[in-house]
Amino acid sequence: MSKSVTVDRVKVIAEMAKQNITGEELAQKAGVGRSAVQKMRKGQAVWRTTAGHVAAALGVSVESLMEQ
């Protein structure tokens, strides 16, 4: 199993907009660095655990943010 995952940037951005949360606010809520949230918003690979923290902070599953 890969230690990194790539999420669908559109899904991340849409969920952030739906919840009216900024990248900085999401990073703080998830306990990750702003750069990790920025990578996810750009569709770049991040550590699986980081994606899990961000998904949990958004109240969604990692799978719902994954590219399909």
Regions found by a protein language model. Name each.
Residues 26-27, 54:
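Short alpha-helical "recognition helix" segments of helix-turn-helix
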Residues 43-56:
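Short, basic-rich loop-to-helix N-cap that marks the start of a DNA-contacting helix
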Residues 1-25:
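A short, Lys/Arg-rich alpha-helix, primarily the initiator
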Residues 18, 29, 57:
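Residues within the alpha-helical elements of helix-turn-helix
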Residues 25, 36, 64:
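Residues in the helix-turn-helix
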Residues 31-46:
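Recognition helix of helix-turn-helix/homeodomain-like DNA-binding domains
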Residues 59-68:
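Short C-terminal boundary/hinge segments that cap the last helix of small helical domains
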